[in-house]
């Protein structure tokens, strides 16, 4: 039987810093060690007590999580009842992923070391992912219906949802945004469209043979771009990609 490799001291220190803030399984995969080695590090350093902090959400952090549940994020249970939030993006949206993570760090919802590469051994699936600390503060989000989440989105949340799950249709010079909503029910899709149109003054409507996506007009590009300028640096990869025609002078 092959002897398991010893943990590098630098890796052990990183595990100590993150122990109790996310699942031991995540730490094992992240640092390429066994699950028992992670637990050994915790036991040797008196870290057996789990840390489940209470979060003080800023509105920006709330909107990142709410929109992410509909978009590229997910809530995962850690233990019997508490949750952590994680989100994954392709490397072409690395700066966007980092921007979101940094907003959560400001509220002590995550820490810098909880951002890591994913599938780096597969050139066709390179991605970047972050996760938050585990907390009972995320339980209410896990219990929300999609309709309740949609109702709580503000202009930032609506923009982030569009950036996560939307794309530019090139049927005109400026193009227009299309939001992928086929996973929503008819009621949820109608609620999303009404939320955009009522709160932002956009002209969203169902498209497609089965009316499962939501399209906006080219004029709505200016509305979304102006919101993006308020919150996200223009040089960020997601802004450069989704608002390319708006940035050309």
Predicted regions and their residues:
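Primarily a LysM-type cell-wall glycan-binding module
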Residues: 19
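N-terminal positioning helix adjacent to the helix-turn-helix/winged-helix DNA-binding module
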Residues: 7-11
């Amino acid at each position: 039987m092959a002897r398991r490799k010893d943990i590098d001291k630098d890796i052990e220190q990183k595990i100590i810093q993150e122990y109790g803030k996310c699942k031991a399984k995540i730490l094992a995969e992240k640092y390429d060690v066994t699950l028992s080695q992670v637990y050994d590090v915790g036991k040797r350093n008196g870290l057996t007590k789990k840390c489940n902090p209470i979060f003080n959400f800023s509105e920006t952090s709330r909107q990142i999580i709410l929109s992410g549940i509909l978009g590229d994020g997910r809530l995962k249970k850690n233990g019997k009842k508490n949750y952590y939030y994680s989100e994954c993006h392709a490397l072409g949206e690395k700066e966007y992923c980092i921007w979101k993570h940094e907003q959560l760090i400001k509220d002590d919802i995550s820490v810098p070391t909880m951002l890591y590469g994913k599938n780096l051994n597969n050139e066709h699936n390179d991605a970047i992912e972050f996760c938050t600390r585990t907390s009972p503060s995320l339980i209410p989000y896990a219990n929300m219906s999609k309709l309740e989440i949609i109702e709580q989105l503000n202009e930032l949340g609506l923009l982030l949802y569009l950036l996560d799950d939307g794309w530019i249709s090139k049927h005109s010079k400026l193009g227009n945004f299309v939001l992928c909503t086929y996973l929503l029910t008819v009621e949820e899709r109608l609620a999303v469209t009404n939320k955009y149109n009522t709160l932002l003054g956009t002209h969203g409507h169902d498209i497609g043979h089965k009316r499962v996506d939501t399209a906006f007009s080219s004029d709505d590009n200016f509305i979304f771009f102006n919101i993006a300028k308020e919150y996200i640096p223009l040089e960020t990869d997601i802004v450069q990609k989704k608002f390319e025609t708006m940035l050309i002078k």
